[in-house]
Amino acid sequence: TFIVATVDKFAQIPLNDKPAALFGITNSKKPPELIIQDELHLISGPLGTMTGIYEAAISKLCERDGVCAKVIASTATIRNAANQIMALYGRSHTQFPPQGLSAKDSFFAIQSTPEEKPARQYFGVMGIGTTATTTLIRVNAAMLFATRYLATLGYPDAVVDNFWTITGYFNSLRELGGASTQILDDVQSRLDYLAKTKFVSVYPGVDTSKGYTYTEELTSRMSNSEITEIIQVKLKRSYTKDNHADVFDYLLASNMISVGVDVGRLGAMVVAGQPKTNAEYIQATSRVGRDNPGLVIAVYNASRSRDRSHYEQFLKYHSALYRYVEATSLTPFSDRARDRGLHALYISLCRYLIENLRGNSQAINYRSDNPEVQKVEKIIIDYVRRVDPDELSAVMDELKDIQDAWDIAATGSLVYKSRKNEKKLLKGDTENDRFRTMNSMRNVDGQSGIYLLGGL
């Protein structure tokens, strides 16, 4: 059996007893024996912290006769992997492929020369004495002109297709929205100027009469079906002399493009400002030049000190990109993480490992002095002792609070969850209660209200 899932569904484990079948608890089937986690670098920060708590439950539920499921996690951008793996899975790790004796030949991968397999070429642009908007307009117009000039020179369709669609990467939806307007107006005006005035005697023949404004965006504002159609259908339309009007001129994207976009024909990208993390920069720019040579132009904002620093250190930075990948942070048993997820871990293990606590109406059967319940407590304590021993004392105290609260709640009628007025153990994520439980992990950050006082 092959199961495809996302980590945000982990939040359903304490809320529902049906997933017990996936672990072979309610049937005679075996639990999962192999877990493949793609894009490990994304399981970091608040999401990774909460995932680490639920992974403690999944690790135990997949265990049979002391043997845990094997985990294979893949990523191209990670640093301090040992700590991340320990915090996320509670295990040591083995890196594959190993470094080998030579960085150029590890047996599993061999370094190729630019002549053998051309890759991406990076350029940095920073306008001095002009605004970042003007610089971005001029760079986009120059890219548009250059790619269209390939067609004018009569290059094969396959070569032109590789650079026809220009991908724009933006750090915020606000910047992306502004660029969308600029492409329809300012970029086209600048393109006309380049074709009819500045380059008319040097690079003649570029036709700008029809305009190149076929633009699509790839952001969280799109629905799942729209995103699928863009990636699987529209982006894969190849350029020919007869159908160029049906091929995107621009693809404007947020950080969504960093994952899951594998379109070989994309070969040109304009990056508007240095992304927030180096891992994000590597992942985003690797979307172009995957099958053919690629060109990435990073447009820096001179008014931002971080952008200026990257521009000044451009050669050094790009000669060792992976050296600057940030270490990820996971703290699954920190104070705020325990507030939001420790009870979910405890309840999940109680429901799945103790038969008379499994059903929705069986929450009332809980007794903290039950030997099976005490085994669950020991499982969690042993896990925390291995993953984050500094938090062990605090975890033990909070487990005692959770047990006392469940003991008190179990004195009357009690269910795990209910949409009716029944007394329920697991409360909604917005309720102010010890047992408030997330329904999904798509939004794991806590929120704080800000009140402005008059006269300030």
Question: Where would I find each of the regions flagged by the language model?
Answer:
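Conserved helicase ATPase motor motifs in RecA-like P-loop NTPase domains
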Residues: 39-47, 57-88, 98-99
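A short beta-strand element within the Helicase C-terminal
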Residues: 257-273, 294-298
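Conserved interdomain linker/interface between the two RecA-like ATPase lobes of SF2 helicase motors
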Residues: 79-87, 92-186
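Non-catalytic terminal extensions of ATP-dependent helicases
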Residues: 184, 209-212, 216, 228-248, ...
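Conserved C-terminal RecA-like helicase domain
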Residues: 1-2, 100-107, 154, 159-160, ...
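Conserved two-lobed SF2 helicase motor
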Residues: 2-14, 243-258
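SF2 helicase catalytic motif II
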Residues: 8-12, 21-64
